[in-house]
């Protein structure tokens, strides 16, 4: 009736859980956001096949790019679970309610793959890079612990990004699945799966790294618990948890997304981690280079970094290297199965990245890969200090830290007699007040290791400074970004009013030759972030 004779379509429908009645909501006679997600989840390239169908091919004439042995008419079959979670940026938009509704408010999304729903869910939650390590079991859960059960039961009915964590807290307190379902109307199947995570947490909370058996390690990892979550639960260091797990012989294996549940061989390696026995990473003796992607799109870190990662993969492949991409964003080109020689759809966390490095080292017969951290924005930069220095290709972690750490950068400029606004670094309000007494208002307050002006403020008076420092005390999500401490000071310096801002992009090779790629003058006055300012070249 609609008239779509060839090509792709997207149909959305609703199911009544009480009686199974189905109601069609809408149809899109084209590929859509969900088509892209389905393609990444299954390895079946819907858009590519839809366009071939539109010019006259039939499904049985189009080969499956992953297996090369089956036609496109062979429907994808999966033996894993995929979880997609949107990435919201309400922290960038103060004053918004944070309540989800019929209008899209997310700025990005993550996708995770696991053998079970609990494993996939916890991997997706830690992929968001919003300070959560999984379904609670992390320092951020302490905020929920202060709220009464009655109040949580009221809040769980409101669709917000935090609702899943509220559900986890209620289940942890012993509230039944039926009671939570009645309050929030989330399908009981999902609540049952989340309760499996809570039950496993209860089962191991009184243990410790040295007391865990191999079977216990495998059980807790198969429901998605990260080493960082277990370290929090046991009051241990993450490195201690990792060492104990590896000593017990429990390391992740990598399975392949192959569209056919392993019925045919996959020629395009597209992997996800789990804790089983057989590893499917292909062995070879070529030099491998791992490119760490940018994670979910957000305000200040988007597709421009994915562009860099993708072209780096193409260039390295042309130079004879075996390219390995690590990312968790289904909206990107970097997570296409044919962009790199091998793709790991994994969270960009210390544990997951070190696991990929270990797997690649083993598959290369002990030859360690190189790792590029400078192309994916702040996400891989924050991980640079947790990766062995000898593995990092390009800019060293020490140089990255020198440029990103406000205190070190200020000291460098001062030693080189480079002019800069007067100011200083502070780790508390008292120190910040001392600085403004010396330099005067207005001042610019900036944390280290941020992108897109995250948590930066132009401050005009003492009351505003008090509020800004209070907000920074609770700010943070990953690595060195967050909080106020000796390791995470903020820069408080004089704001230059009526100034013109200029960006210079340069690239340097190992011989010392420098090429200036562009000089951009901002149209907006200083104080407007470069991402929000028009600019002109030259």
Label each PLM-derived region with a short phrase.
Residues 229-280:
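C-terminal amphipathic alpha-helical interaction region
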Residues 1-224, 247-252, 262, 266, ...:
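ATP-dependent carboxylate activation and anion-phosphoryl transfer catalytic cores
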Residues 298-308, 379-384:
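Glycine/threonine-rich flexible loop motifs
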Residues 34-37, 299-302, 400:
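A generic structural signal for short coil/turn motifs at secondary-structure boundaries
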Residues 372:
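N-terminal Rossmann-like NAD(P) cofactor-binding module of classical short-chain dehydrogenase/reductase
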Residues 389-391, 395-456:
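A conserved helix-loop-beta module that forms one wall/lid of the active-site cleft
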